[in-house]
Amino acid sequence: GKNWEKYSISADYEQITLQPGIIGQRVNELLAPYGRKFAPDPASVKSAMVGGIVMNNASGMNCGTHANSDKVLISARIILMDGTLLDTGNPVSRASFEVSHRDFIRRICELRDEIRTNEKLAERIRYKYSIKNVTGLNLLPFVRFDDPFEIIAHLMVGSEGTLAFLSEVTMKTEYDYPYKASAMLYFKTIKEASRAVVAMKKLVDETGEWTVKGAEMLDYKSLSSVNDPVFLKYKGEVASSALPGVEPGDETGLTAVLTETKARTPEELQQNISAIEACLQAFTTYIPVRFTDRPEEYSKYWAIRSGIFPSVGGTRQPGTTCLIEDIAFHIEDLPEATAELQQLIARHGYNDACIYGHALEGNYHFIINQSFSTQAEVKRYEDLMNDIKTLVVDKYDGSLKAEHGTGRNMAPFVCHEWGDDAYKAMKAVKELFDPQGLLNPGVIFNDDPQCHIKNFKPLPLLVMSDKRQATSLVADKCIECGFCEVNCLSCGFTLSSRQRIVLQREISRLKQSGEDPTRLALLEKQYRYPGNQTCAGDGLCSMSCPMGINTGDLTHIIRQEALPKGSLGYKAGDFVANHFAGVKSALRPVLSLANFGHSLLGTKAMSGITKGLHNALGIPLWTPAMPKSYQLQATELQATSTMQHNSAALVA
């Protein structure tokens, strides 16, 4: 994302132009002073960048289908496969494109008319996009817009880089309600929780706006992964047979719905809360309904929700892979479909799996921790995905991918979900934008019906010495979510903390397998500068890691193993540390000599000569920024001492 973080806000604050590398949370920080916010709100908003949010149509907990990237996008600046730069919001760029790409525009218009003429297809598109759906390419623009440039811009949403490079977007901002309240509602069954969500979805105020702005479902496994205190209480009561109607020892029914309402005034907020509480009287909750409008309280609820994926992933067995999928059902099907989904996952033996997500939109994520080490495990996963396809598509006509891009895992099922006519239209769009099929191949469109059960990425355990094993076990919990990268000082310069773990896993895999010693040696050599030497080692990465993994600790281990006690490098460093004054005095003439050489030879010649010596002998590389030698005078030392004394006096 570095160097792609420019932005501009319109004079009325209702539009913002963004480059793709800026993080979603940063956009919210920029808009907050004006009472506005970035409409898409995925749980990963503190780490996800605008480009990824748009190209995956990652929506989130509140924006639903009414304020996702597709609905708030105004224009896009893209670079096509042939190198053409098109800014759909710039009249000059549009006019130029109409001349240079006449056939391209004509084909977009033909596809638009073909889809609209096929009334059955057009109606299916409207129906499919009435809920969250990112399976395949985005066909909705063909029925929403007449202007071919509007269609082109909106085709980018959810396209996962398969059509063009997105270099800039202009989007509508959203009003940020100043008054908010949330409640964590607990139900004894997932079906009862779903019925309550369906009822709350129907609540609207006098202006026609939804009273409930968000309803996030968390099943029992989600609650267990974060040690939710209410879940622990429920578990204890169930274990002691203290709950009538609940099978002793069966805590799998407890389901939470994190509910949020927002308003323009305190009075309006209270009206909303009263309306929701009245609605919920028709349902039995495990504990009484209690809303809070205190940010310090409800922010904890939402922090729990945002951390579910990495927290559940962190409980996986070492060596297994944490997989997440997101599906969507129509709201009227929610109670039955949700219960069947839970039963289906359990039937396949995924006892540590969890279901959670945006219940108000009928959109759920489910997480499984999967081993691919045996053919039996691969077959189990294949059977699960086939049954998911049958449940979601064949029975409920829902979405196999709701908000995070199709990906390779769902690519084999795109045609099955959409049907031949829609799939043919998607293929025509792909062929128009990328006739050679070079952009992100195999994603969205894949001719291999088994591509989702091939080429699995291994997650080998890190190999460390016995004394360092505790730290490596912590790092083994990494699910490579990337939440750490926002705090990593070297991210964008060399490697991020996540990438360091990824590379160390590959190094460990090669060590364990012994399959390619040459590649192992090359990786270890190439890792030294970007992986080891440029890591700050300060542990800031752990502050945004849900598992608290400190990649700096891993770097310290690598450094210690590279320079063990008794080695020449360790002895040299130890000597310098204990004789710094003498070493400093000895190095002063070296700096003077380097400065003399620079003044005599000039920058160009000095750089060339020292670079040659560096390559031949390994001496430190000279740069024009290298300082001259300097020795503090007695008066300067006295002044420094006086300043330190005064500072100490002020502190006292």
Give short role names for the model-derived ranges.
Residues 143-149, 153-383, 391, 396-399, ...:
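C-terminal substrate-recognition/cap domain of FAD-linked oxidoreductases
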Residues 28-33, 38, 327, 333-349, ...:
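Iron-sulfur-associated redox domains of electron-transfer enzymes in respiratory
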Residues 393-400, 405-535, 544-568, 574-579, ...:
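Ferredoxin-type iron-sulfur electron-transfer modules and their immediate structural context
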Residues 98-143, 433-486, 492-509, 604-642:
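Flexible inter-domain linker/hinge segments
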Residues 53-62, 149-174, 357-363, 400-401, ...:
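Conserved phosphate/anionic-ligand binding catalytic regions in large, soluble enzymes, centered on
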Residues 44-51, 135-138, 142, 216-233, ...:
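A glycine-rich phosphate-binding loop feature that marks nucleotide/adenosyl-phosphate handling sites
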Residues 1-42, 58-110, 177-188, 323-332, ...:
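N-terminal glycine-rich flavin-associated loop
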Residues 314-318, 514-652:
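Iron-sulfur-cluster electron-transfer modules
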